[in-house]
Amino acid sequence: MSRAKSPSPTGIPTQSIIWAAIGWATLALMFYLFLSAPTDGPHIIKPEECNKVVKDLIVRPNWYRYGTYLFQTVAITFSGILCLRNWRSPKIISGRNVWLGLGLGILSWGIGNLIFGYLDFQYQSGLIAGGAKGAANLVKTFPSIADIFFTATYVFLSWGMAMSVIGRRLNLYPKQWGVVGAVGFIGIGLAAYVTFGAGGGFTLDTGKILNIVYALGDIWLLIVATILLLAFWGGKAAQSWRLLGSAGIAMFFSDLWFNYSINISDICKAKPYQSGEPAEFFWILAFILWGMAAALEFDLSSRPTGRSRRG
């Protein structure tokens, strides 16, 4: 990455973008690791779905939750912009549709995340404000209108990641294809356990259908990410593709943990889902890696070729 010094159209050197991304990821990691403990409480609540009062509810403070959304939104915004910059540039040699899909997917996820965050704050605030008397007509965080954007995210990301491998001469050895198959099999097993095992069996309600859609999208991202890592393991010119693969894997694990947390939550036992889990850092990591990949690919594509240097 030491050669990535060419300036972007905004005048910011690519190397500065890379270091800023690494710095933001480091700050986010420390924020999640050291400040994520629930400290607000205990509260006494009476949710509608519970037969009795729930005591000793301890939640994460709002200032911490605001901080997590700040870290996520900044990473999403800059990564989405960098991906769309690649799509608009005629110099990109890697296929502009790759970056269009990634950019739209990232920004769609960001919109859905902000909507989900608003609903999550409304739900928890109303629940605590209701106290032992109970709170009625609370907003639902899942499923909600935010899932429209999350579903669109999987469509765009799956398309963008697919474009990164379709039409390319991958030249994987049989053993490498075996690794891809094994990773896919493990991913299917993990997703099935989270969706159906921890999720309470097979049903066809809206929430379960969405979980299945998300699981399928995550499995696809994991498989494509594995292919990219195996096919583009060496060489500086392949750095952006390795970062794309790493981002897909980070997205898989963060989504898997989110679905698991939702499925095992039980508000009646004072164990509700709470945003701000340390595992959410992998969302930020995924978006940062996508943004770094976009910056490196733009830098590589903007360099003069040997022919042009010879005049």
Protein language model features and the residues they cover:
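Polytopic alpha-helical membrane-helix bundles and their juxtamembrane interface segments
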Residues: 2-311
